Design a protein with these regions (language model features):
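Preference for long, amphipathic alpha-helical scaffolds in soluble/luminal domains
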Residues: 1-245
Length: 245
């Protein structure tokens, strides 16, 4: 990894907010104290998506991130999981507006698939039950290559959800993970790889899996020595490397 870990942590501590500083101190092995309030989370547990509205997909991703940094037992994680359970639709799925789906979407149903995949992965990682209908819905959205209706980000989340729902090495999980290796899009960058790795870390996919190994190596090679101008991306990359190493 070309990233200077100590230098990047110092940048976060000097330029980041309280939440980033808390994470940086923990990564550096220092006493970080109590977890501060997480930016973007409302008082009932939901996290804001790209539009600023509370989003099941964004909340699922945030809950997976808390699992990644070993904070799944924190109050912020507990109320996020509670909020997700409360947001289940009558069809036992979850729903986001298309504008709240990250990346390039390829289907009008992307909001439903993204929200359901991210939430299913997060709830299973948090030892909660998303219900059998949620994963049955997701399985019906997977094509013969392993791609999921809605695009890249729903496929990343589905891979983690399938690993947890069906077990390691099962067909749905491996199809989705293979798709991420064999059908990579030109527009994918460090943000896409870091997001995928967050879902996969929460799901417990091991570092030796070919998809994890490839994405982690690409993330390492893309990192500037001083880190990205996006402090959140820099900090997340450091957390992912620490987790998988």
């Amino acid at each position: 990894m070309s990233l200077d870990v100590d230098g990047a942590l110092e940048r976060v501590l000097s330029g980041g907010d309280e939440w980033r500083a808390w994470r940086a101190l923990r990564l550096g092995g220092d006493d970080a104290g109590a977890m501060p309030r997480i930016p973007g989370q409302d008082r009932v547990g939901g996290f804001a998506g790209p539009t600023g509205r509370p989003s099941p997909g964004a909340t699922g991703l945030a809950l997976c991130h808390l699992e990644l940094i070993s904070a799944a037992g924190a109050p912020a994680a507990i109320i996020a999981a509670d909020w997700l359970e409360a947001m289940r639709t009558p069809a036992h799925a979850w729903l986001d507006a298309p504008d709240d789906v990250p990346g390039v979407i390829d289907d009008r149903g992307a909001g439903r698939v993204w929200a359901t995949a991210a939430t299913t992965c997060a709830l299973l990682a948090a030892r909660r039950d998303p219900g059998p209908r949620a994963f049955a819905l997701l399985r019906g959205e997977v094509d013969q290559e392993g791609h999921v209706t809605g695009g890249t980000y729903p496929t990343f989340a589905l891979a983690g959800a399938a690993w947890l729902a069906e077990g390691p090495g099962t067909e749905t999980a491996e199809w989705a993970l293979r798709w991420t290796r064999e059908w990579a899009e030109e527009w994918w960058g460090p943000q896409e790889r870091a997001t995928a790795l967050t879902f996969w870390a929460a799901a417990g996919i091991p570092p030796e899996h070919p998809s994890v190994d490839e994405f982690l190596e690409e993330l390492r090679s893309e990192a500037p020595q001083e880190g990205w101008t996006d402090l959140d991306l820099t900090l997340l990359a450091l957390e992912l490397v620490a987790h998988f190493d």
